[in-house]
A protein has these predicted regions:
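Solvent-exposed loop and capping/linker segments of extracellular ligand-binding repeat ectodomains
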Residues: 1-145
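Polar low-complexity intrinsically disordered regions enriched in Ser/Thr and small residues
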Residues: 4-6, 12, 38, 74, ...
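Generic serine detector
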Residues: 5, 24-26, 31-32, 54, ...
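Surface-exposed intrinsically disordered loops and tails
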Residues: 47, 128, 194-197, 201-224
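Extracellular/luminal ectodomains and secreted, surface-exposed scaffolds of diverse proteins
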Residues: 53-55, 75, 210-217, 236
Length: 290
């Protein structure tokens, strides 16, 4: 017979490799099995910012911006728990996962998940075979696309403070903005409670009168200039009307949503400064502390 051990008999255990779930490897190494079969490796391979992660260095996942996971992940939920509180992570590449794929829930709602080609999921912010059905971006959280993809629909929402008095002449009303897609539609709610579409003023002070006006400026070598074009990865300053001197149908408060359909999202570039007359502007899609 083969004796009392399942690893004796027809083969030598020291010449064999036992593959186990990534988060369980320490359990196996502490068991009697490790003394019999001393080559035990995880089923999944994980990197954090291009550095290989071992079961002993999982703390790297707590601060990594880019995570890759490949192989087999029967312990998908346990792996997810290793970076569940990481608000810095902007992408999780799981294209190399061969079985037990689960869409992870990241602390950063803007995190992109690049899923295996065979994945069939409806989650937001998931890219499959170069296409995402829906990307939803949250204000004040980081975003970075390591590789380009097509988005059937993409949107970003910013909340306008009702207490903030804003118009083109009030410097306190202006805010910086940069988005990773060409914006085609901007929608908001006016102070009368109506859902409205917005149109920026042009250099002549004109706008689409079927919509509500707002101010959009880009930096030029002559200073800030009005524009009606909202391009990807370009820094702007923006201002929405909200003043007691204006009609409630013009004033904008609450959520403003910027969106586009069939958008081509490029890999996030290295941003260079845009030169102005008196100062420069540089875009960022990362969280910046004041």
């Amino acid at each position: 017979g083969n004796g009392d051990s399942p690893f004796t008999g027809a083969f030598k255990p020291e010449n064999c490799t036992l593959k186990v779930p990534f988060t369980s490897i320490s359990v196996y190494k502490e068991s009697s099995i490790y003394g019999i079969m001393n080559t035990i490796v995880p089923l999944a391979n994980i990197t954090a910012d291009n550095e290989e992660v071992s079961p002993e260095t999982t703390d790297l996942l707590a601060t990594a911006k880019k995570i890759t996971i490949s192989g087999s992940t029967p312990d998908a939920l346990e792996i997810q728990a290793l970076f569940a509180s990481n608000e810095k992570v902007t992408s999780i590449d799981m294209t190399g996962v061969i079985e037990y794929f689960e869409v992870p829930v990241a602390a950063n709602p803007n995190c992109l998940v690049y899923a295996p080609a065979s994945a069939q999921v409806e989650n937001n912010n998931v890219v499959i075979n170069g296409t995402a059905k829906k990307i939803v971006l949250t204000d004040a959280m980081p975003f970075e696309a390591p590789t380009a993809f097509h988005a059937d629909a993409i949107s970003y929402t910013r909340t306008i403070e009702e207490s903030l008095t804003t118009n083109a002449q009030e410097t306190t009303g202006w805010r910086g903005i940069v988005l990773p897609f060409d914006v085609s539609t901007i929608q908001a709610r006016n102070k009368a409670g109506e859902q409205v579409e917005l149109s920026a003023y042009n250099a002549e002070g004109e706008y689409d009168t079927s919509k509500n006006p707002f101010w959009l400026r880009e930096l030029t070598t002559e200073g800030f200039a009005a524009t009606q074009t909202f391009s990807a990865n370009t820094p702007y300053i923006i201002c929405f009307p909200n003043s007691s001197e204006l009609d409630e149908h013009i004033n904008i408060i609450g959520d403003v949503t910027f969106s586009a359909s069939n958008a081509e999202i490029t890999a996030t570039p290295v941003f260079n400064a845009v030169e102005g007359k008196d100062f420069d502007m540089i875009a960022t899609l990362q969280t910046v502390s004041a």
